[in-house]
Amino acid sequence: MSPRLRLQPEAVGIGMTSQRVRDRLVDRLREAGIVDESTLNAIRVVPRHLFIDEALASRAYEDTALPIGHGQTISQPWVVARMTEAVLQVAPKRVLEVGTGSGYQAAVLGALGLEVYTVERIGDLLRQARKRFRALGMNIRTKHDDGRVGWAEHGPFDAIVVTAAAPALVDVLIEQLAEGGRLVAPVGGPSAQSLVQLDRRADGSIEQHVLAPVTFVPLLSGMLD
């Protein structure tokens, strides 16, 4: 699976946002255990510097989370890559993301040619993400809503990616997962979280295991404009 993103010249970047800098990030991710080449290529292609404030652009290709306002962050590239790599293992076509945030995770999935649906509870963040998707020519379906309820009318989904942590996996989201599908989500409280992978088998059974320790902002209910 190869990235399908056609970038405008301004997305290519110069200096601290150049292709050479992105290649170094990909090398670090590979050294940190990311092995799926499609995932690494998507990380290389998607311009992370366009998903953060211009003042932080020089840090865009560091392997670290960065603030995006409203108490939210753009996830660490390793975490984005690990979640992407995990869901690609089930060869999904339709993916639900809970928590659009900056839009970066959705863009990585979209660059891989997946049909992406993403839900965000904070209206201002979603409006900014939509502008980025349009600028990159990405056809990502977006919705301003409480992410904890998912997007049932477009389900079931082959994969679900949750980008904020809840004390336990959300049953409503599990119900929107197709047979043979995979959900990846951070689970835990402020002091300790784990990235959990849940698989719904063809016989309807559920199997889950922990991928890695992580740190995410909390998954909140309700909506903000």
Curated annotation (Swiss-Prot):
PROSITE patterns named among the record's database cross-references: PCMT (PS01279)
Primary enzyme class: transferase
This protein's record includes keyword Cytoplasm: yes
Residue intervals passing through the bilayer: none
Entry GO MF terms: protein-L-isoaspartate (D-aspartate) O-methyltransferase activity
Catalyzed reactions per annotation: [protein]-L-isoaspartate + S-adenosyl-L-methionine = [protein]-L-isoaspartate alpha-methyl ester + S-adenosyl-L-homocysteine
Domain of life the protein comes from: Bacteria
Keyword Transcription regulation: no
GO CC annotations, alphabetized: cytoplasm
Coiled-coil intervals: none
Keyword entries, A-Z: Cytoplasm, Methyltransferase, S-adenosyl-L-methionine, Transferase
Active site: residue positions: S75
A Pfam family of this chain: PCMT
Function text: Catalyzes the methyl esterification of L-isoaspartyl residues in peptides and proteins that result from spontaneous decomposition of normal L-aspartyl and L-asparaginyl residues. It plays a role in the repair and/or degradation of damaged proteins.
Family to which the UniProt record says this protein belongs: Belongs to the methyltransferase superfamily. L-isoaspartyl/D-aspartyl protein methyltransferase family.
NCBIfam families cross-referenced by the UniProt entry: pimt, PRK00312.1
Protein name: Protein-L-isoaspartate O-methyltransferase
Organism: Stenotrophomonas maltophilia (strain R551-3)
Gene coding for it: pcm
